């Protein structure tokens, strides 16, 4: 229940505030950790393809463990102080994991630069949110790049984090952000990241497999609420969702292309190398600047639907768990009250301590480590310096021997 409340609060803060410039961000710390470990492992591991792949696996495991364990430890410590402190801290963590308003703001900077006719400024603005080379892009290519990155990051930056936060709270959310950040920094097929980025890239494909497909379906639902062409969106999704090197990237891009009636993807330059890509969608019309705010609204509606879905799925389980805890507390309280009343009505009869049983004296006399002077305790006759378990074993074995 507390994690679900933190998710809702963090989502609302993200919609209102976004990521203020200059405010410390955990993802920046994760990125610095990745860079430091990458440099260190490149110096330590062999300069061979297998050595670099091993370095990538070590880096992935170390970053994931640290990124998950540190938030979990902080939440546990804050919970010891107060549950309200834990709620506040986890709400801030959820806010920093989500990226709805920041993605919308950065893409709208591209829109504003395009509307003002400043191609250089629009290239610079779009370079902040895409990984491709932007110095060769024209007006339409800049617009297409902005629409593509918003469509793709609807899954990576909005839907998938919401799902992981709903399942496991802030620690699992930071686990996802670590996996996604490593893929963004290292998951390239060109040197020097070809080998060291293999494990981070494949891990990101596995982690995003289900969220990417859920994102596509939720985006279709959002398009229906916005009055877009959902029939074309479903048709392009079924046809073009595999037209990408990544098994996940084209899921939401194909839906977006069909809903907007434009053509996305195509050839792109990365680190000076031209990558041939298939087009996604049909060119029912030319892409325009207005498609950028349109896809931003589509992303926001998709995010709200994801939050509602997450709350609707998790809330019954949270209430059931709370109900079980309440029932358990009531049962324990009833048992305690019953025992107290029965003790008051039927007080126990005081008994006098009897002398040690004959079998104990006989057994202790034959044991050199025992004393002949037993001590009465609540559990029976036991020597103080002797472990209780050993004395019980001797007593039980001796009693059995006597009975037989």
Q: Model segments located where?
A:
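Hydrophobic alpha-helical transmembrane segments
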Residues: 1-175, 179, 187-326
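Positively charged N-terminal leader segments that act as targeting/secretion signals
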Residues: 323, 327-342
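Cysteine-centered motifs
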Residues: 325-326, 337, 367-370, 382, ...
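N-terminal, intrinsically disordered charge-dense segments
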Residues: 338, 349-351, 355, 377
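Short, intrinsically disordered C-terminal tails of secreted or membrane-associated proteins
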Residues: 392-393, 397-403
């Amino acid at each position: 229940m507390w994690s679900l409340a933190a998710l809702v609060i963090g989502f609302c803060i993200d919609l209102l505030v976004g990521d203020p410039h200059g405010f410390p961000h955990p993802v920046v710390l994760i990125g610095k950790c990745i860079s430091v470990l990458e440099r260190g492992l490149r110096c330590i591991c062999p300069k061979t393809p297998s050595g670099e792949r091993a370095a990538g696996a070590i880096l992935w495991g170390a970053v994931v463990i640290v990124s998950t364990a540190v938030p979990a430890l902080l939440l546990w410590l804050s919970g010891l102080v107060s549950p309200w402190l834990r709620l506040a801290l986890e709400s801030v963590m959820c806010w920093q994991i989500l990226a709805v308003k920041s993605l919308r703001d950065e893409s709208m900077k591209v829109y504003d630069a395009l509307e003002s006719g400043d191609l250089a400024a629009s290239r610079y603005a779009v370079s902040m949110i895409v990984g491709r080379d932007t110095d060769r892009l024209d007006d339409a290519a800049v617009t297409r790049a902005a629409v593509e990155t918003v469509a793709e990051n609807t899954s990576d930056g909005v839907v998938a984090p919401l799902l992981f936060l709903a399942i496991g709270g802030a620690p699992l959310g930071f686990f996802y952000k670590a996996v996604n950040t490593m893929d963004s920094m290292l998951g390239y097929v060109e040197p020097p990241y070809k080998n060291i980025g293999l494990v981070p890239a494949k891990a990101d494909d596995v982690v995003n497999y289900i969220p990417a497909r859920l994102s596509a379906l939720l985006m279709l639902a959002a398009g229906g609420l916005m009055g877009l062409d959902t029939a074309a969106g479903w048709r392009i999704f079924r046809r073009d969702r595999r037209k990408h090197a990544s098994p996940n990237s084209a899921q939401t891009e194909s839906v977006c292309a069909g809903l907007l009636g434009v053509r996305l993807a195509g050839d792109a330059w990365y680190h000076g190398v031209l990558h041939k890509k298939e087009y996604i969608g049909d060119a029912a019309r030319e892409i325009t600047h207005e498609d950028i705010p349109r896809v931003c609204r589509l992303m926001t509606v998709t995010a709200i639907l994801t939050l509602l879905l997450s709350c609707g799925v998790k809330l019954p389980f949270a209430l059931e768990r709370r109900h079980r805890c309440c029932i358990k507390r009531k049962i324990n309280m009833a048992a305690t009250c019953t025992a107290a009343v029965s003790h008051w009505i039927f007080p126990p009869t005081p008994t006098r301590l009897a002398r040690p049983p004959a079998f104990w004296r006989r057994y202790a006399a034959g044991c050199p480590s025992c004393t002949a002077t037993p001590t009465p305790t609540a559990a029976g006759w036991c020597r103080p310096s002797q472990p209780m378990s050993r004395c019980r074993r001797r007593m039980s074995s001796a009693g059995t021997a006597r009975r037989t």
